[in-house]
Swiss-Prot record:
Gene from which this protein is expressed: bcsB
Signal peptide positions (record): 1-18
GO BP terms, alphabetized: cellulose biosynthetic process; UDP-alpha-D-glucose metabolic process
Organism this protein belongs to: Komagataeibacter xylinus (Gluconacetobacter xylinus)
Pathway(s) of this molecule: Glycan metabolism; bacterial cellulose biosynthesis
Functional summary from the UniProt entry: Binds the cellulose synthase activator, bis-(3'-5') cyclic diguanylic acid (c-di-GMP).
Example of a GO cellular component annotation carried by this entry: plasma membrane
Protein name in UniProt: Cyclic di-GMP-binding protein
């Protein structure tokens, strides 16, 4: 009852005040499309930071007596609940862990910096503290300069400069727990002034907050709400940016149908978590604390759950037998086919799940997928509006230093254009109207994947005639809108991409100290388009970079219906966990459950011979893997990976390899590695069972090495290191090799075949050129011989007549 009363009081106190609307602050540094991960919390006691006497003055938040009393009552009740239940947890995050790439620096043109973070919906904040350190310019006037700290537009405190001591901190600010919502924004707003007249854009006036400043949050768990409609909660909360851990409980470590059902669930969770990443530890019993997902036939469920009455495919949420705050999701049925149906009920019917804690799932027909139709991939048969990729608000900027506007997009990486013809980016953007900024020095810079493409002035300065015509109402229409078409080189487009638009604004020179406008808006038109329609789907394999960036070639069909996973006959929990993590990676890549993938043991590979194969194995089962890698240049024996024997034609064949790959062809002695001690290998080659199909083998001495390899594959920071046909992972160190012959996946029209054959192969051009020369010489020799023979006959005939 005390807990219920506490919750009711907190809900009442929170409801009495409208949820604050967070202001939109620019990120401290444009850091790609990945949002900042929220790390695992460090549980420790909160310790106040004492401010020394020579540090800048701080101002504590003030509130009216009534609201302060209400807040104190809420906090007192929360503290009593903590003491009674002893379940309070203190989470300590540095600003760097919340997403700050470096110190949050503010100056004249960039006065606002902010960070976003989330509070899980099943947690209640009872107290919080912000501990800040940093520095402020000694040129600032203490009376009229300050950094104001707010949380969701609610005042927390103020930092004021001390010219004699530029650095400050650590300074501690208590935060009212009522200020917290599920999605929070912590803002630092800078107001500056100095003696005399100072141009705010010259960098003399500044303030910075260290990325090592800390936010301490104390939370208690709320009573669980077991409603299927809340999925993926409580297993995943979209407001929390940390990597997600979702335990799975399987009665049997290897059962193809149950593993297929589990893979569908893992890919759905991967689809929900997207960039955050997710891992699925596998257990045979329910964890003592927290949440878990149990998958299996009803008769084989853990005994701790009791006997569950099941009449068909069933989804059910029950309490963790060992933890009343934990929730166990049951995905079950009377047989294995019903378990698969139940998993599809989540994968394809999550939007229709009821508010109840139990549901009987009807059979679901999801239909067949077609190639390259993954929901996360942009179409390549038409121009795509930027407004289809991001909301309109993501294309709007404000002020002199608005930060980069990011438009992430994904595409199948096997794109090819005739003679490397570029793609088209049609950009429409709107500049501030009137004499607000110096348009001759202001521009829109456009890039892709951190590579500069083009810069356009915001607007050409008006001529004298234009100014006169504008004043009398005869000017050129809306010339604040510009339209440009720019090329995008095909080699700059990968599986995961990010278009960047940066408005570089220059202030107008004002006489004296007259301030110019500080609030104005720019935007990229949502009707701007990116056009990849001049491309074809064809590429040369193996290429592990395609796997790392887009799961290619397995994600050619979003449901992996042309792919199969090969596991050992008796995999342990770590191997199964690696399989689930890989399916989560596929779901995050395509945004679609892997309902079409088959799971087989090594004894049944021939049943899926016509599919692309993903093999996960340890050294104990490496004999089966060696047969599937017979078309590669690598062999596995006695726990070691080494280069296999190559024919005398290998050197000649290497002349016809792709020189633009960035990976050098290796000699037979270049690869010699043991796969023990945490070392793992990822090998890609053509399948010996079907021409044009791919085998991807993930190998290690134990299941832990396999699991680490999958986690490395899913981390975007490692994508540039994963290339070629072999990657060796020694912890976080990756080494790439290329040695195996290339093969072609995909087709092009007949008229493009010659260009494709010569593409990036100067050796082939030379050979074809030589053959052409030989052919021309042969034709000329034959023609000259015929001419000489005819001339000889003519001479003989003339002699006979004379």
């Amino acid at each position: 009852m005390k807990m219920v009363s506490l919750i009711a009081l907190l809900v009442f106190a929170t409801g009495a005040q409208a949820a604050p609307v967070a202001s939109k602050a620019p990120a401290p540094q444009p850091a790609g499309s990945d949002l900042p991960p929220l790390p695992a919390a460090a549980s420790q006691a909160a310790t106040p930071a004492a401010a020394s006497a020579d540090q800048p003055a701080t101002t504590a938040p003030a509130a009216d007596a009534a609201s302060a009393s209400a807040a104190d009552a809420v906090v007192d009740n929360a503290e009593n609940a903590i003491a009674a239940s002893d379940v309070a947890t203190v989470h300590t995050y540095s600003l760097k862990e919340l997403g700050a790439q470096s110190a949050l620096k503010m100056q004249g043109a960039a006065t606002l910096q902010g960070l976003q973070f989330g509070i899980p919906a099943d947690q209640l904040v009872t107290s919080a503290r912000l501990i800040v350190s940093g520095a402020m310019s000694p040129s600032l006037q203490p009376d009229t300069s300050a950094v104001t700290i707010t949380l969701n537009e609610q005042f927390i405190g103020t930092l004021r400069p001390d010219p004699t001591h530029p650095t400050f901190g650590p300074l501690s600010f208590d935060i009212n727990p009522i200020f917290f919502i599920t999605g929070n924004r912590l803002n630092f707003s800078f107001a500056s002034s100095s003696k005399g007249c100072t141009d705010p854009s010259n960098g003399l006036l500044w303030a910075s907050v260290s990325e090592h400043s800390e936010l301490q949050i104390t939370t208690i768990p709320l009573p669980p709400r077991r409603q299927l409609s809340r999925l993926p909660q409580p297993f995943f909360d979209k407001n929390v940016k940390q990597k997600i851990v979702i335990p799975f409980v399987l009665a049997q470590t290897f059962d193809p149908e149950v593993l297929k059902a589990t893979g569908i669930l893992a890919s759905w969770f991967g689809q929900q978590t997207d960039f955050r990443g997710v891992t699925f530890p596998v257990f045979s019993t329910i964890p003592q604390t927290g949440n878990a997902v149990v998958v299996g036939v009803a008769d084989e469920l853990p005994s701790a759950l009791g006997r569950q009455a099941v009449n068909g495919p069933t989804l059910m949420e029950v309490a963790n037998p060992s933890d009343p705050n934990g929730t166990v999701l049951l995905v079950t049925g009377r047989d294995r086919d019903e378990v698969i149906t139940a998993s599809k009920g989540i994968g394809f019917g999550s939007s229709a799940l009821p508010t109840a804690n139990r549901m009987d799932v009807a059979p679901i027909d999801v239909g067949a997928r077609v190639a390259y139709d993954a929901p996360s991939f942009i179409p390549t048969n038409r121009p795509v509006r930027l407004g289809e990729l991001v909301p309109d608000s993501a294309l709007q900027a404000q002020g002199y230093a608005p930060g980069a506007l990011s438009v992430p997009f994904r595409v199948s990486p096997d794109l090819y254009t005739w003679r490397d013809r570029p793609y088209k980016l049609n950009v429409r953007f709107r500049a501030p109207p009137g004499p607000i900024v110096d348009v001759s020095r202001s521009s829109l810079n456009v890039g892709i994947n951190d590579t500069y493409l083009e810069a356009y002035p915001l607007r050409e300065p008006d001529s004298t005639l234009d100014q006169i015509l504008r004043r009398v109402g005869l000017g050129r229409g809306d010339d604040s809108v510009q339209k440009h078409t720019m090329p995008i080189p095909p080699y700059r487009v990968f599986g995961q991409n990010q278009l960047l638009f940066y408005f570089e604004m220059a202030a107008m020179a004002e006489p004296g100290c007259k301030p110019g406008p500080s609030t104005f808006h720019m935007s990229v038109d949502p009707d701007s388009t990116i056009d990849l329609s001049n491309s074809y789907h064809i590429t040369r394999m193996p290429n592990l970079a395609f796997m790392a960036s887009a799961g290619y070639p397995f994600t050619t069909y979003a449901d992996l219906s042309r792919s199969a996973v090969v596991l050992p006959d008796h995999p342990n929990g770590m191997v199964v966990s690696a399989y689930l993590d890989l399916m989560g990676f596929m779901g995050a890549t395509t945004w679609y459950p892997v309902s079409g993938v088959d799971v087989v043991s090594s004894d049944h590979v021939n049943d899926v011979a016509d599919r692309n194969l993903i093999v996960l194995s340890t050294l104990a089962n490496s004999g089966d893997v060696s047969q599937l890698l017979s078309k590669s240049s690598y062999q596995i024996s006695d726990g070691r990976l080494h280069m296999g024997l190559r024919s005398t034609l290998s050197g000649v064949w290497n002349l016809f390899q792709d020189p633009m790959s960035g990976i050098s062809n290796t000699a037979p002695t270049d690869v010699e590695s043991t796969l023990t001690g945490g070392v793992a290998a990822m090998i890609e080659a053509e399948s010996p069972l079907a021409s044009g199909r791919t085998v991807l083998a993930l190998l290690s001495g134990d299941g832990q090495g396999l699991n680490n390899l999958v986690q490395i594959l899913a981390q975007r920071k490692n994508q540039a290191k994963i290339q070629g046909d072999l990657v060796l992972a020694h912890g976080d160190d990756l080494t790439s090799y290329r040695s195996s012959p290339l093969y072609t996946v995909g087709t092009v029209p007949l008229w493009l075949e010659p260009d494709w054959y010569m593409h990036n192969h100067p050796s082939r051009v030379i050979v074809v050129g030589l053959l052409g020369c030989i052919l021309i010489v042969a034709v000329m020799v034959r023609a000259l011989a015929k001419h000489a023979l005819r001339r000889r006959r003519e001479l003989q005939e003339e002699r006979q007549r004379t």
